[in-house]
Amino acid sequence: MENVCFQQRLRDLETRVRKWKFLKLGLTEVRLRPRDRRSTSVDQKHKECSSTSSSPQHQRPNNIGYLTSPMERKFTPLSMKPSPSRRDTEKDALEYEFLEGYKKSGTLEIDGEKQVVDPNEIHIISLLGSGSCGVVESATVRSKLMAVKTMYKNDNKENLKRILRDVRIMSMCNSPFIVTSYGYFMFDSSVKICMQIMSACCEKLLRRIYHSKLDFFPEFVAGHIVYSAISALDYLKEKHSIIHRDIKPSNILFDDSGNVKLCDFGISGFMTDSMAHSKSAGCPPYMAPERLTIETNSKYDVRSDVWSLGITVYQLVTGLYPFPLNDMEFTTLTIIANLNLPSPSLREETKRSFSPLFIEFLDLCLRKDVRERPEYRQLMKHDFYLDYDPASGSAYKFKAINGKCNQVADWFVDVIRLSKTEDELKSIPNTPCVN
């Protein structure tokens, strides 16, 4: 009898354990009909314990199946695949966007006509530049000279986001101040963007000038850069709610006609209520103070790009980055972020003279307190900007002939003629080395 009661208690324990497991796993209990249950070795007449047993009586329910069974158990291999609830939905969305992008892969707009182009029709000429995200080469496609930017894919989500942003933003933009995209090719391991070819970026020009001991960017060239860059940034904000976030000398390009255009939208962002949120996007030496401060780093607006443009222009006209650089980049960024330390100013420049308007304009761009720094539309009303805006009428300083900004183009040609190509690879002291 004791053995019978022990087995009864064991069955009760199994029932409780089974119920606990089903509740914990969120499963629905499967109940077996009485005729489907397999009997154990206990005879039916011993289903109940004697009243003399020391254990309390428990009436076993008639329709609860066993968790265990005398039958041989089957072992199911453990699956290592994530359940649907644990899938990386962000990466799934990126992969879906790539699949959608394949639909337009190979369709290029050449001389105003959309053409389906085979990748084998890309004939590479030479390397124009390289960076952490890929390479840019000159090439011909159906006799059209263009630049081909190749970006390599991997499983990193930030890498995929950067490629998709660059493709998406370049495809949607139509501005004379932004490098034109003709289309793209998508492959399993890379993406190629075919775009308008430019002659040189400001960073390479600055290196040529420095090592050839030429005069740095003159004020009228800086004015043309300011006008073109702010026009491009304002277009991005007003038409597409985009903030560039990576303004620096290497992303401002010249062509032979003196036109200036922005490029590289891999870390650009779409703004919500005119605010951006990403904390890490951008090149730290050119980041605005508010983006380097913990308290304000969660949100910022286009005025951060105004600061980046100010630092860039200061560097172009003086030949030097305006903050001390050393092995500890943290120290440099701390100086930038410290609102109690003065901002750089051309007023302190003694080697060259600049107009009061230019000095005042750059001082506005380099206000450390973001609340005192103007946005694009405010800067576009400043007299220095108007001096280089063709729409300003009599205030405009240049006369464009046949689409060519003569003075800027002449200056550019002289720099190329008087400097050496190999100087583009040489660094400049106290200047950030960025890609």
UniProtKB/Swiss-Prot annotation:
Q: Tell me its cofactors.
A: Mg(2+)
An example GO biological process term is: MAPK cascade
Provide the free-text tissue specificity comment from this protein's UniProt record: Expressed in most neurons, including nerve ring, head ganglions, dorsal and ventral nerve cords and tail ganglions.
- Top-rank taxon of the source lineage equals Eukaryota
State where composition is biased (Basic and acidic residues): 35-49
Q: What GO molecular-function term can you cite, just one? A: MAP kinase kinase activity
Write out the catalysed reaction.
Answer: L-seryl-[protein] + ATP = O-phospho-L-seryl-[protein] + ADP + H(+); L-threonyl-[protein] + ATP = O-phospho-L-threonyl-[protein] + ADP + H(+); L-tyrosyl-[protein] + ATP = O-phospho-L-tyrosyl-[protein] + ADP + H(+)
Compartments annotated for it: namely: Cytoplasm; Perikaryon; Cell projection, Axon
- Name the keywords, alphabetized: ATP-binding, Cell projection, Cytoplasm, Kinase, Magnesium, Metal-binding, Nucleotide-binding, Serine/threonine-protein kinase, Stress response, Transferase, Tyrosine-protein kinase
Disordered, as annotated region: 35-90
Does this entry carry the keyword Transferase? Answer: yes
What InterPro entries does the annotation carry? Kinase-like_dom_sf (IPR011009), Prot_kinase_dom (IPR000719), Ser/Thr_kinase_AS (IPR008271)
In which residue ranges is the amino acid composition biased (Polar residues)?
A: 50-66
Oligomeric state and interaction partners are given as: Interacts with unc-16.
Q: What is this protein called?
A: Dual specificity mitogen-activated protein kinase kinase jkk-1
Q: Which organism is it from?
A: Caenorhabditis elegans
Upper lineage is: Eukaryota, Metazoa, Ecdysozoa, Nematoda, Chromadorea
- Tell me the name of the encoding gene: jkk-1
